[in-house]
Amino acid sequence: MKKFRIQGPCSLSGEVMISGSKNAALPILFSTLLSEEPIELKNIPELKDIDTTLNLLKQLGVKAKYQPPDSIMIDAKAVNHFCAPYELVKTMRASIWALGPLVARFGRGQVSLPGGCAIGARPVDLHIFGLKQLGAKIQIEEGYIKASVEGRLKGAHIVMDKVSVGATLTVMSAATLAEGTSIIENVAREPEIVDTANFLNILGANIQGAGTDKIVVEGVKRLRGGAYSIMPDRIETGTFLVAGAVSRGKVVCRHTQPATLEAVLAKLHEAGAQIEVGKDWISLDMKGKRPKAVNVRTTPYPGFPTDMQAQFTLLNIVATGTGVITETIFENRFMHVPELIRMGAQVKIESNTVICHGVERLSGAGVMATDLRASASLVLAGCIAQGITTVERIYHIDRGYECIENKLRKLGAYIERIQGAQ
């Protein structure tokens, strides 16, 4: 099993080209099931989760061909299987997004109850609720969610019980082929939902309101083919900006969207960073100074993203002063904290809050990644710690960061991927 070996400390400075968004690419890939015509997707990142998604789609009968450097041709005309099996779904919760398109286009579909990062309970209840409102019959048996409908799904007025990115994407995609109008309220507003809606509209869907708390979908009978470029990854952008902040360096992120990161940029500015933005770039300069501790509360977009919480925990750990981070989206999302304590962090967890008392420096240690974003914080910690840090279980980071060690090396990090003990 591979691991990272990192020699610190170092100041990270330079330019980073941001990859396509994992959190947009996954629902868009699953949404290709809605069309029987060829689709070209561009700016697709090379990630483990993308590979898993393509393997799942191929098992359903989808033809997928990679075209360097970052495009994939998708043809879902000959789908002849309607079940997403446990072997693939267990590694990635996003597989639930196959269910809506399958039942919308083919009248049936089944997906194994999902797996993925071990971050608390991410129930599928809201996905099921939304599909039922559209007329789908749902059964849960033998570890599978089975959905079916006679004829087409029917448009409905749906008020989601809770703001959920995943459920919003499921219901919105299924509603594109439903008969009539669907009004979906209390939906998530994340940019990745807007990107998915824009993609579906390119194919002939009629979706309005994505990015607000109410989405209106006028159902159509079929979707055509087309070409679409995935949005840049705002979480990868934020991660590399934090890399510059915690190492007292200067980092420029290119091919990104500053407007999707306003909450993160505000906190980085509060931490003492000099921030400049252009149309598709963001510059962060710490002028060689330690960051100042900040208080953060994760909330749905446009609030501070839960996927940046672990990185800001690290920022507070090496900042001047004391910072409090409150996690309101997922429970059990502080699994990186005990690992950072091994490196010298002064941190206290109280329920869904982590209190960080800043220290001057961390010490290298052997640590273990527990989930995608936590693994990123551990890698960055290794870059700024005194001595050698090894990060185990880096398959977590490969799920969501494209060539992270190569990008960090270009910024001045001493990091290598090595073979660990079996």
UniProtKB/Swiss-Prot annotation:
One Pfam family from the record: EPSP_synthase
GO BP of this protein: cell division; cell wall organization; peptidoglycan biosynthetic process; regulation of cell shape; UDP-N-acetylgalactosamine biosynthetic process
Top-level taxon in the UniProt lineage: Bacteria
Keywords from the UniProt entry: Cell cycle, Cell division, Cell shape, Cell wall biogenesis/degradation, Cytoplasm, Peptidoglycan synthesis, Pyruvate, Transferase
Pathway: Cell wall biogenesis; peptidoglycan biosynthesis
Subcellular location: Cytoplasm
InterPro entries: Enolpyruvate_Tfrase_dom, Enolpyruvate_Tfrase_sf, MurA_subfamily, RNA3'P_cycl/enolpyr_Trfase_a/b, UDP_GlcNAc_COvinyl_MurA
Primary role: Cell wall formation. Adds enolpyruvyl to UDP-N-acetylglucosamine.
Xref: PANTHER family: UDP-N-ACETYLGLUCOSAMINE 1-CARBOXYVINYLTRANSFERASE
Descriptive protein name: UDP-N-acetylglucosamine 1-carboxyvinyltransferase
Species assigned in the record: Hamiltonella defensa subsp. Acyrthosiphon pisum (strain 5AT)
Source lineage: Bacteria, Pseudomonadati, Pseudomonadota, Gammaproteobacteria, Enterobacterales
Gene: murA
